[in-house]
C-alpha cells in the first residue's frame, strides 16, 4: 500500500500540472470568444493566432506530462501486476471500453474547437455559445479518472475482489521494485530538470504572448475607431460632392443663358455703334473747334474710362465665364480624385493590414516551430510591428488632415462661386448703364486725341523757339563771362584776419552784385600825405563768402541748359592756390555733381517730348603738358601716348587711349569722380599743403535725338579745375616743384592769350582769318571747340580773403578782368 500510494502521488502530481494548464487555457478560451463577438474580422484573426499559440504550448506541456505519465504507468503496472493478473481480461476490456468512449470525445472536442475558430471569422454569435459548451465538456473530462491504475482500482473495489500475493510474487515485486526505484529516481531527476526548463520556457512564451496580445488589442481598437471615422468622413464627402454636382448643373444652365444674352447684346451694340458712328460723323466735324480749350487731363481720364468700359463689356465677361467653367470642372475633378484617392488609400490600408496579419501568423508559426529563437529576436519583431503600426496611424492622420483641407477648399470655392455670380450680375448692370455713353465717349476721345496731337506739335515748335531764344539770351549776356567768388575764412584764420580789411562789396545788397573792391596797402604821396590805395573790379557776378554752392549753381544752370540744347560749354575755376577752386568744382555739392543731377532731372522731362539722350564722359588730367587718364590708373603708370583729334564737322574733340564711360545713372558719375580724385597729382608747397599741381578736365558728351521730329543735337560740357597759380617768389618752389609751377603759369598765360585772340578776331573788321594760338598749350588745344566759335565760356575767379595773399589776389583779379573785357560777337545758330 505504501508503494501504491507513492506511485499515486507521483501520477497525481503529473496530472495536476496538466490539469492546471488545462484550467488556465480553458479560462482563456472561455474569455476569448466573448471578446471576438464584440470586434471585427481583424480582431478575430489576431485572437485565432493567439489561441493557436496557446494550444501549441498546451500540446508541448501535454507531451512533457505524457512522458511522465508513461513512466508512472510503467511503474504502476510493475507494482500492480500481481493484483491485475487475476483480472487481466476484465482490465483489458475496461481499458478498451474507456478508450472507445474517451477517444471519440477527444476528437469531437478538437473538431469543435476548430469549428469555433473558423466560425469567429464570420461574426456568428451562436458559434461562441458552441465553444462555451465544448469547454464545459473539457471540464467534464477532467473530472473523470486520470489513468489506468485508478480505473483498475475502482473496478476491483466495485467488484469486491481481494487477493493476497504469494511469497514468490512478493519477492519478485520487491526486487523489481528496488531496480525500478533506482532507475526511476534517475529518470525522475532528469524529467524534473526538463520539466523545470520547459516550465520556464512556457512561462516566457506566455508572457511574450500576453504582451503581444495587449498590443494587438490596442492596435485593433485604434484602427477600428479610425476606420469608422474615415467611413463617416467619406460618406460626408460623397454628400458634399452630390451637392456640388447639383450646383454645377445649375451654374451651367445659368452660363448658357448668360452666353446667349451676351451674344445678343454684343450684336445689338455693334449695330448701334455702326449706325451712330455714321450719324455723328458730320456732327463731329462741326464741333471740333468747341473743344480746343479743354484741359489735357480730360483726354487721359476719358481714355481710362473707355478702357474700363471696353474691358468690362468684352474681356472680363469672357474671362469670368472661362474662370467659372474652369473652377467648376476643376472642383468636380478634384472632388472625384480626392474621393477615389481616399477610397483607394483605405482599401490599400486594409490590404496592408491583412497582409501584415498573415505575415504575423507565419511569423508566429515559425516562432513556435523553432523553439531555439531567443527572446531578443521576438522583441525585435514586436518593435518592428509597433513601428509599422505607428506609420499606419500617421498615414491615417495625414488622410484625415487632407480630408479637412479638402472640405475647407470646397467651402471657400463655394463662396468664391457665389461672389463671382454676384460680380457677373453687377457687370451686366454696368454694361446696361454704360452702353449708352460708350459712343459719346469714344467720339469725344477721338476729338481730344486730335487736339492733343495738335498741342504736341505746337509744343515741339515752341521747344525749338525756346532753344533759339535761350541761346539769344546767353549771347546777349556774353559768350565769355567771368564770375568772382571769395572763399570764407577758415576757423584757424578767423582770429588773425578780417575780410573787411581786404575786400569790400559795394553792391552786396543788389539783385545781382557785380562789383568788388580790393583794399591795398597805404601809399604816401609826394606831399607826404598817406591814403588807401583801392582797386575796384567789375564782373558779371560777384559771390560773397557767405554764398554757398547751390546759389552759385543757379547762375550757371542756364549754361548747362545750353549744353543740353547742343552747344559746347566750358566752365573754368581759376585762382591762386588755396582759393577754393576744387571745392567749387569737385566737392560733393560742387558744380560737377550739381550739373550732373540737373542734367538727369531735365532729361527725364524731355523724354516725355520724344527726346532720347545718351551721356558719355571722360576725366583727363594735364600735368607738365602731358595728358593722363584719371579713370585708368594702370595706364597712367605705363604713360601711353594721348593724341588730340578734332572733328571740324561735328565740332567734337577726341583723345586717343582714354576711357569713355556711359552714364546711365547718377551713381555712375559720382563713382567716377571719386576714382578720378584719388589719382590726381597733388603736392605740398609753401602756399598750400595740398596744392593741385595739374589741370583736370571733365568732358561730358550729351547726344540727343527726337524720334518724332528726327532732330539731333550734340553738345559738350567741359568742367575744368585749373591748377593753382602761384608766384615763384612766394611759393619758393625748387626742382620738380619749380618746373611744375612754371608749366602751370605758362598754360594759364596761354589760356589768357587764346581768349584775348578770340576777342580780337570777333571785333576785327577785316575779312582775314585771325590766328588763334590753341596749340601753344595742351589745355587750350583740348578745349578748342569749347572756347571759340559758337561756344559758351564761363570762368570762376576764386580769390582768397587773406591779407598775406594780396598780390596773388590782385594778379588773379587782373587776369579775370582781362578775360571779362574780351567780347565775342554773336555767332550764327548752327543746326545740330
From Swiss-Prot:
It comes from the Eukaryota. Residues 193-266, 284-305, 344-481 form a coiled coil. One of its GO terms (biological process) is microtubule anchoring at mitotic spindle pole body. The keyword Signal does not apply. GO terms for cellular component: cytoplasm; kinesin complex; kinetochore; meiotic spindle pole; meiotic spindle pole body; microtubule; microtubule organizing center; mitotic spindle. It is found in: Nucleus; Cytoplasm, Cytoskeleton. Keywords: ATP-binding, Coiled coil, Cytoplasm, Cytoskeleton, Microtubule, Motor protein, Nucleotide-binding, Nucleus. The keyword DNA-binding does not apply. PANTHER family: KINESIN-LIKE PROTEIN KLP-3, PROTEIN CLARET SEGREGATIONAL. This is Kinesin-like protein 1. It comes from Schizosaccharomyces pombe (strain 972 / ATCC 24843) (Fission yeast).
Amino acid at each position: 500500500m505504501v508503494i501504491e500510494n507513492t506511485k499515486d502521488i507521483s501520477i497525481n502530481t503529473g496530472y495536476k500540472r496538466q490539469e492546471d494548464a488545462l484550467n488556465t487555457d480553458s479560462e482563456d478560451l472561455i474569455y476569448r470568444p466573448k471578446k471576438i463577438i464584440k470586434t471585427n474580422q481583424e480582431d478575430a484573426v489576431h485572437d485565432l493566432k493567439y489561441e493557436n499559440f496557446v494550444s501549441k504550448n498546451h500540446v508541448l506541456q501535454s507531451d512533457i506530462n505524457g512522458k511522465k505519465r508513461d513512466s508512472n504507468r510503467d511503474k504502476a503496472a510493475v507494482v500492480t501486476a500481481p493484483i491485475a493478473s487475476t483480472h487481466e481480461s476484465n482490465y483489458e476490456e475496461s481499458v478498451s471500453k474507456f478508450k472507445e468512449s474517451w477517444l471519440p470525445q477527444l476528437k469531437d472536442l478538437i473538431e469543435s474547437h476548430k469549428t469555433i475558430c473558423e466560425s469567429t471569422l464570420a461574426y456568428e454569435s451562436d458559434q461562441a455559445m458552441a465553444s462555451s459548451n465544448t469547454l464545459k465538456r473539457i471540464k467534464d473530462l477532467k473530472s473523470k479518472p486520470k489513468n489506468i491504475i485508478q480505473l483498475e482500482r475502482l473496478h476491483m473495489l466495485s467488484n469486491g475482489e481481494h487477493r493476497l500475493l504469494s511469497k514468490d510474487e512478493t519477492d519478485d515485486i520487491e526486487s523489481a521494485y528496488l531496480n525500478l526505484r533506482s532507475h526511476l529516481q534517475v529518470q525522475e531527476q532528469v524529467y524534473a530538470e526538463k520539466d523545470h526548463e520547459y516550465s520556464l520556457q512556457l512561462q516566457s512564451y506566455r508572457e511574450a504572448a500576453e504582451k503581444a496580445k495587449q498590443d494587438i488589442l490596442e492596435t485593433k481598437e485604434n484602427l477600428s475607431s479610425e476606420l469608422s471615422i474615415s467611413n463617416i468622413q467619406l460618406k460626408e464627402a460623397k454628400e458634399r460632392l452630390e451637392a456640388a454636382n447639383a450646383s454645377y448643373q445649375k451654374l451651367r444652365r445659368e452660363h448658357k443663358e448668360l452666353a446667349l444674352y451676351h451674344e445678343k447684346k454684343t450684336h445689338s451694340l455693334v449695330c448701334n455703334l455702326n449706325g451712330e458712328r455714321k450719324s455723328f460723323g458730320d456732327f463731329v466735324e462741326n464741333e471740333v473747334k468747341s473743344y480746343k480749350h479743354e484741359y489735357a487731363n480730360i483726354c487721359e481720364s476719358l481714355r481710362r474710362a473707355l478702357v474700363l468700359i471696353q474691358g468690362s463689356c468684352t474681356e472680363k465677361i469672357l474671362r469670368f465665364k472661362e474662370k467659372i467653367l474652369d473652377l467648376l470642372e476643376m472642383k468636380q475633378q478634384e472632388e472625384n480624385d480626392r474621393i477615389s484617392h481616399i477610397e483607394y488609400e483605405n482599401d490599400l490600408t486594409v490590404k496592408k493590414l491583412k497582409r501584415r496579419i498573415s505575415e504575423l501568423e507565419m511569423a508566429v508559426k515559425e516562432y513556435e516551430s523553432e523553439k531555439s529563437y531567443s527572446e531578443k529576436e521576438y522583441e525585435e519583431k514586436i518593435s518592428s510591428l509597433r513601428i509599422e503600426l505607428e506609420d499606419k496611424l500617421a498615414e491615417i492622420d495625414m488622410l484625415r488632415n487632407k480630408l479637412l483641407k479638402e472640405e475647407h477648399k470646397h467651402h471657400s470655392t463655394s463662396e468664391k462661386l457665389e461672389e463671382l455670380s454676384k460680380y457677373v450680375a453687377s457687370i451686366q448692370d454696368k454694361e446696361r448703364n454704360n452702353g449708352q455713353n460708350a459712343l459719346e465717349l469714344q467720339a469725344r476721345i477721338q476729338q481730344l486725341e486730335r487736339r492733343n496731337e495738335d498741342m504736341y506739335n505746337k509744343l515741339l515748335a515752341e521747344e525749338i523757339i525756346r532753344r533759339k531764344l535761350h541761346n539769344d539770351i546767353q549771347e546777349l549776356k556774353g559768350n565769355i563771362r567771368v564770375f568772382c567768388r571769395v572763399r570764407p575764412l577758415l576757423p584757424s584764420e578767423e582770429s588773425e584776419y578780417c575780410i573787411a580789411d581786404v575786400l569790400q562789396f559795394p553792391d552786396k545788397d543788389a539783385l545781382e552784385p557785380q562789383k568788388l573792391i580790393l583794399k591795398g596797402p597805404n601809399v604816401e604821396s609826394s606831399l607826404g600825405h598817406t591814403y588807401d590805395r583801392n582797386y575796384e573790379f567789375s564782373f558779371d557776378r560777384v559771390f560773397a563768402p557767405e554764398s554757398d554752392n547751390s546759389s552759385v549753381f543757379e547762375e550757371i544752370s542756364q549754361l548747362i541748359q545750353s549744353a543740353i540744347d547742343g552747344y559746347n560749354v566750358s566752365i573754368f575755376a581759376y585762382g591762386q592756390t588755396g582759393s577754393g577752386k576744387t571745392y567749387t568744382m569737385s566737392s560733393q555739392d560742387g558744380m560737377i555733381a550739381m550739373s550732373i543731377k540737373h542734367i538727369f532731372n531735365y532729361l527725364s522731362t524731355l523724354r516725355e517730348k520724344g527726346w532720347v539722350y545718351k551721356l558719355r564722359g571722360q576725366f583727363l588730367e594735364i600735368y607738365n603738358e602731358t595728358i593722363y587718364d584719371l579713370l585708368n590708373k594702370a595706364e597712367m603708370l605705363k604713360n601711353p601716348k594721348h593724341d588730340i583729334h578734332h572733328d571740324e564737322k561735328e565740332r567734337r574733340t577726341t583723345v586717343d587711349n582714354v576711357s569713355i564711360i556711359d552714364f546711365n545713372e547718377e551713381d555712375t558719375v559720382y563713382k567716377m569722380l571719386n576714382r578720378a580724385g584719388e589719382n590726381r597729382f597733388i603736392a605740398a608747397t609753401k602756399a598750400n599743403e595740398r596744392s593741385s599741381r595739374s589741370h583736370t578736365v571733365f568732358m561730358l558728351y550729351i547726344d540727343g535725338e527726337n524720334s518724332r521730329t528726327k532732330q539731333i543735337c550734340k553738345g559738350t560740357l567741359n568742367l575744368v579745375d585749373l591748377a593753382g597759380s602761384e608766384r615763384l617768389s612766394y611759393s619758393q618752389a625748387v626742382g620738380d616743384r619749380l618746373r611744375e609751377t612754371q608749366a602751370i603759369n605758362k598754360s594759364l598765360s596761354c589760356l589768357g592769350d587764346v581768349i584775348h585772340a578770340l576777342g580780337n578776331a570777333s571785333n576785327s573788321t577785316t575779312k582775314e582769318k585771325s590766328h588763334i594760338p590753341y596749340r601753344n598749350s595742351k589745355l587750350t588745344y583740348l578745349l578748342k571747340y569749347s572756347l571759340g566759335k559758337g561756344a559758351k565760356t564761363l570762368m570762376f575767379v576764386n580769390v582768397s580773403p587773406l591779407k598775406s595773399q594780396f598780390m596773388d589776389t590782385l594778379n588773379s583779379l587782373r587776369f579775370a578782368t582781362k578775360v571779362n573785357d574780351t567780347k565775342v560777337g554773336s555767332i550764327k545758330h548752327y543746326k545740330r
